[in-house]
């Protein structure tokens, strides 16, 4: 059995549904300590975080990941127990197989091999692991980044083990992510009888023209790395349930996924301008889930791309699509952040799985990336 497969099986067998860690990090810390890592647990709010570092000199290469997984859903719909790693038809099945316990296992083994071959390597290595990536993400990576910044630890490169590959290992890596700006809008009206609309003020009718304008706006044109910003209504609720009552208010929840071509302030200003111009009486609460980040082509993208090409023969696409990740926190303290891992077709789904024949190549890509970054210095 490969060392990566052995480790990922151990991790899957620990039912670490967010924010639980189920001693995944403790097991990994003990393993890393044997090859010279200094390990530190940072816990808050029921969340466990691990910062493990080997070396004190720069450059510092960090692997970031999460030991928590999403709930399995109805277990009876799985073909095998989601927390009993099962090999079948060339795949390893289990919750977290792709997202992202295989990446963690591959990087740990890659580091073990790298240190064994190059015990006096220049620079430093580190792991940043959390059990709060799939949850609210308020006691996880963000507080570790705050602690590192407060004590002046300088990160140079970070690889986040998110499952970025689309069709086969190595076809896509993420060199950035869009930002997320949510809003909860309450449009105020006057409740009344539908037969006497002149004695009421219907907030749905009032908001409809503004809604049509908002969904038709071209917020920006995107840029070389990002698609244009999008605006989507996710929920729209109004009324009492009765068919003869004009509602007193309409509550609208929306989200903007935005690129570096826009800022949260510019998006907020445009929304308020539309609402004000339509004469609406409203309250609007904003929630900035994360700002966009981007790592332009450079030493980290080149190191990873070269490693992928050497191992798979593929030239990876650099992409910024998809949802948010913990990379948004790390990018504030690390100038170069990239995400790379196995295929993502089954993440969060029933029968989540990872191809068995990608585990060792994934480990090799991570190891080659370390060699490209640290042995050239």
UniProtKB/Swiss-Prot annotation:
Binding site for Zn(2+) 2: 99, 134, 348
Chain sites annotated for binding Zn(2+) 1: 66, 99, 162
CDD domains assigned: M20_DapE_proteobac
Catalyzed reactions per annotation: N-succinyl-(2S,6S)-2,6-diaminopimelate + H2O = (2S,6S)-2,6-diaminopimelate + succinate
Pathway membership, UniProt: Amino-acid biosynthesis; L-lysine biosynthesis via DAP pathway; LL-2,6-diaminopimelate from (S)-tetrahydrodipicolinate (succinylase route): step 3/3
Superkingdom field: Bacteria
Cofactor dependence: Zn(2+); Co(2+)
Family of this protein: Belongs to the peptidase M20A family. DapE subfamily.
Biological role stated in the UniProt entry: Catalyzes the hydrolysis of N-succinyl-L,L-diaminopimelic acid (SDAP), forming succinate and LL-2,6-diaminopimelate (DAP), an intermediate involved in the bacterial biosynthesis of lysine and meso-diaminopimelic acid, an essential component of bacterial cell walls.
Subunit structure, as described in the record: Homodimer.
UniProt name for this protein: Succinyl-diaminopimelate desuccinylase
Organism: Bordetella avium (strain 197N)
Gene: dapE
